[in-house]
């Protein structure tokens, strides 16, 4: 019995021993392998990239200048079966750090040997060539270990005697001089070229502006023509649409008028039927009862008229009879009064002044009553006089004025009656 072992692409599995013989070895990476119990051995080795930083301090160059050089190398174990077998023979069972130390010492040795064959300028100014030379020299040695150099670069080169800085200053001065000359020449050429470019630019710009203006004018003209044509077509289409709409509206209106005529005819027929029905209904519900009521009222009015006529005739007859009776009474009373006045006149004529005196005396109380009527509202009359002769004279004055008052009131002149004349004359 045994186990199935798997391994990723960053590792290699080494299976040794087994049923096939003690010298059988199987190398697997990124797959699986079968290992028997007790008689098979399985080990793993890393295939990942290892980063090394070789450093050589104070190594003399071909000119005897001590330099310190540092670099960066990327290495890994190769996966070809023969080279992987070589690497496993040398590094199987060791950790990654042990492998890195072996390769690092090899690279540093080759780096030192190459530094002794080159000048400072070659090392400093052409680092790529220096790194390429180190990689070419060291590759066979590390290859025999099953190691592949993926990349090698020079990280830094410096010295402790300022050789590189002095070399740099001289070179910098030369470069600065050449740079100033180059800048001046470049500025001169740039100014000339700039002026030429500006001229060319302005020429091109003016030509472009002219072409743009021409194109714009042509565009506007074409646009105006198109717009005019579009407006004409639009107006024609709009007019055609409006005419067609007017025709359709006219047709619709004609149909509506015909529908309205038909509806009106139907409505007139319905209204005629309704009028007939209403007329019949009015005749049945209003006219006939109204005629009956009018006939009844007419009969009642005629009866009332006859009644009123008869009553008026009776009342007139009554009034006439009463008038005749009253006229007879008045006539009799007038005749009696005339007879009485006649008799009184005959008596007054017969008795003369005595009769007139009796008539006056008969009227005096009434006259006195009329004269004294305002005095009825007086409770007491006080005559203030200290002399009795004055009161007497006042009474005589009143009596003297009496005939004039009677004559004014009755038209009878008392002064012509002897008795009154004598009485008033005696008082005077």
UniProtKB/Swiss-Prot annotation:
<dbReference type="GO" id="GO:0072659">
    <property type="term" value="P:protein localization to plasma membrane"/>
</dbReference>
<feature type="modified residue" description="Phosphoserine">
    <location>
        <position position="405"/>
    </location>
</feature>
<dbReference type="GO" id="GO:0099072">
    <property type="term" value="P:regulation of postsynaptic membrane neurotransmitter receptor levels"/>
</dbReference>
<dbReference type="GO" id="GO:0005912">
    <property type="term" value="C:adherens junction"/>
</dbReference>
<dbReference type="GO" id="GO:0032839">
    <property type="term" value="C:dendrite cytoplasm"/>
</dbReference>
<dbReference type="GO" id="GO:0001931">
    <property type="term" value="C:uropod"/>
</dbReference>
<dbReference type="Pfam" id="PF15975">
    <property type="entry name" value="Flot"/>
</dbReference>
<keyword id="KW-0130">Cell adhesion</keyword>
<dbReference type="GO" id="GO:0044291">
    <property type="term" value="C:cell-cell contact zone"/>
</dbReference>
<feature type="lipid moiety-binding region" description="N-myristoyl glycine">
    <location>
        <position position="2"/>
    </location>
</feature>
<dbReference type="Pfam" id="PF01145">
    <property type="entry name" value="Band_7"/>
</dbReference>
<keyword id="KW-0449">Lipoprotein</keyword>
<dbReference type="GO" id="GO:0016020">
    <property type="term" value="C:membrane"/>
</dbReference>
<dbReference type="GO" id="GO:0031410">
    <property type="term" value="C:cytoplasmic vesicle"/>
</dbReference>
<protein>
    <recommendedName>
        <fullName>Flotillin-2</fullName>
    </recommendedName>
</protein>
<dbReference type="GO" id="GO:0002080">
    <property type="term" value="C:acrosomal membrane"/>
</dbReference>
<keyword id="KW-0564">Palmitate</keyword>
<dbReference type="GO" id="GO:0030864">
    <property type="term" value="C:cortical actin cytoskeleton"/>
</dbReference>
<dbReference type="InterPro" id="IPR036013">
    <property type="entry name" value="Band_7/SPFH_dom_sf"/>
</dbReference>
<dbReference type="GO" id="GO:1903905">
    <property type="term" value="P:positive regulation of establishment of T cell polarity"/>
</dbReference>
<comment type="subunit">
    <text>Heterooligomeric complex of flotillin-1 and flotillin-2 and caveolin-1 and caveolin-2. Interacts with ECPAS.</text>
</comment>
<dbReference type="InterPro" id="IPR001107">
    <property type="entry name" value="Band_7"/>
</dbReference>
<dbReference type="GO" id="GO:0045121">
    <property type="term" value="C:membrane raft"/>
</dbReference>
<dbReference type="InterPro" id="IPR027705">
    <property type="entry name" value="Flotillin_fam"/>
</dbReference>
<dbReference type="GO" id="GO:0030027">
    <property type="term" value="C:lamellipodium"/>
</dbReference>
<keyword id="KW-0967">Endosome</keyword>
<dbReference type="GO" id="GO:0005768">
    <property type="term" value="C:endosome"/>
</dbReference>
<keyword id="KW-0597">Phosphoprotein</keyword>
<dbReference type="InterPro" id="IPR031905">
    <property type="entry name" value="Flotillin_C"/>
</dbReference>
<dbReference type="GO" id="GO:0016323">
    <property type="term" value="C:basolateral plasma membrane"/>
</dbReference>
<dbReference type="GO" id="GO:0010629">
    <property type="term" value="P:negative regulation of gene expression"/>
</dbReference>
<comment type="similarity">
    <text>Belongs to the band 7/mec-2 family. Flotillin subfamily.</text>
</comment>
<keyword id="KW-0519">Myristate</keyword>
<dbReference type="GO" id="GO:0043123">
    <property type="term" value="P:positive regulation of canonical NF-kappaB signal transduction"/>
</dbReference>
<keyword id="KW-0472">Membrane</keyword>
<comment type="function">
    <text>May act as a scaffolding protein within caveolar membranes, functionally participating in formation of caveolae or caveolae-like vesicles. May be involved in epidermal cell adhesion and epidermal structure and function.</text>
</comment>
<dbReference type="GO" id="GO:0044860">
    <property type="term" value="P:protein localization to plasma membrane raft"/>
</dbReference>
<feature type="lipid moiety-binding region" description="S-palmitoyl cysteine; by ZDHHC5">
    <location>
        <position position="20"/>
    </location>
</feature>
<dbReference type="GO" id="GO:0005901">
    <property type="term" value="C:caveola"/>
</dbReference>
<dbReference type="GO" id="GO:0098937">
    <property type="term" value="P:anterograde dendritic transport"/>
</dbReference>
<feature type="lipid moiety-binding region" description="S-palmitoyl cysteine; by ZDHHC5">
    <location>
        <position position="4"/>
    </location>
</feature>
<dbReference type="GO" id="GO:0030139">
    <property type="term" value="C:endocytic vesicle"/>
</dbReference>
